Regions:
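A short beta-strand-to-alpha-helix junction
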Residues: 44, 107, 139-147, 191-197, ...
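Catalytic-adjacent loop/helix segments of enzymes that bind and process anionic phosphate/sulfate esters
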Residues: 27-70, 81, 124-125, 133-144
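Histidine-centered active-site microenvironments of extracellular/periplasmic hydrolases
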Residues: 78-81, 159-213, 222, 272-274
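Short, solvent-exposed loop/turn segments at secondary-structure junctions
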Residues: 72-77, 94, 129, 134, ...
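Active-site regions of oxyanion-processing enzymes, predominantly non-cytosolic
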Residues: 2-14, 45-103, 149, 161-170
Length: 284
């Protein structure tokens, strides 16, 4: 659990590998003054590689019937990727950021845009110019970090297959939030646009669950549906106080009756002690 660990284990690992830094944020600066320059650490020593190594080391001593909650931090700001992932994709091949007309703007948009800017997505570039070139470069780094994550998930899947556990293992891949990446001139996650809250959810069911693989569900779902889905697939009773609904019927191609027609996403724009940028903007 890298988030609860706050990178302490990885920081210790880097120190043991003779990486020089006083504070952890320094390791997230690229090696020179280009935002898409490689990270100071190698791909073998990245936080993504470190967590995967730790997971595989731990799984080798686990008896069957284990459960692993593997929280990869990247891709997440600050955006910096080790070679070769920093230059794996070309900025000029990135999708162009979406724009919004003045007439379609919401009153929350102006303070939201100021809450996080492109310079806040990287370390060491406080005077970073806000422009399409910057957006494309950061997007290319982000996609490179996804490619790195994909490679390490592949390591986990290969190990599961080599140990003949892949078929019987339930695998759930999702994220707690998305990233705006310059869409509508917004950065970070504190927004109501799809880029911030429309996150992926991929489920690889155990072989014993009969259904068609590769199904794409078009119906609405929420992150709170993940827990009841896992419990349902494992044959464990779902407590009455669980808010979500099991997605298991969809895996069996049986859409539940009266399935939800709407979902809820929540962003806390306020703070009772220190006024947020939104509270200050609207005088709340």
């Amino acid at each position: 659990e890298m988030r609860f660990d706050t990178n302490k284990s990885w920081k210790k690992y880097l120190k043991e590998k003779n990486y020089k830094f006083d504070k952890l944020f320094e390791i997230f600066e690229p090696i020179d003054k280009k935002i898409n320059a490689p990270a100071k650490y190698s791909a073998d020593d990245s936080d993504t590689a470190f967590l995967t190594d730790s997971l595989l080391k731990d799984l080798q001593i686990r008896k069957k019937g284990w459960c692993a909650h593997v929280t990869y931090v990247k891709p997440h700001p600050p955006f910096v990727a080790p070679a070769p992932y920093n230059s794996l994709l070309r900025p000029n091949e990135m999708p162009i950021a979406h724009k919004i007309s003045t007439n379609d703007q919401h009153p929350f948009d102006d303070p939201s845009k100021q809450f996080r800017r492109a310079k806040d997505m990287v370390i060491g570039f406080q005077n970073l110019k806000e422009c399409s070139k910057t957006t494309a470069e950061i997007r290319a780094i982000y996609m490179g970090l996804i490619a790195e994550l994909d490679a390490h998930l592949g390591r986990v899947f290969r190990w599961l297959k080599e140990t003949e556990q892949y078929d019987e293992t339930l695998i759930v891949i999702t994220s707690d939030h998305g990233e705006m990446l310059g869409d509508y001139d917004c950065w970070g996650k504190m927004h109501y646009f799809d880029g911030a809250f429309h996150v992926p959810l991929m489920i690889k069911a155990p072989k014993g669950l009969q259904g068609t693989h590769g199904i794409k569900i078009k119906e609405q779902s929420e992150s709170i549906d993940v827990t009841p889905t896992i419990l349902d697939i494992m044959g464990i009773g779902i407590p009455d106080d669980i808010d979500g609904s099991s997605l298991k019927p969809f895996l069996l191609e049986k859409k539940p009756k009266n399935w939800k027609k709407s979902t809820m996403s929540e962003v806390d724009f306020g703070d009772p002690i220190n006024p947020t940028i939104w509270q200050s903007h609207f005088g709340l």
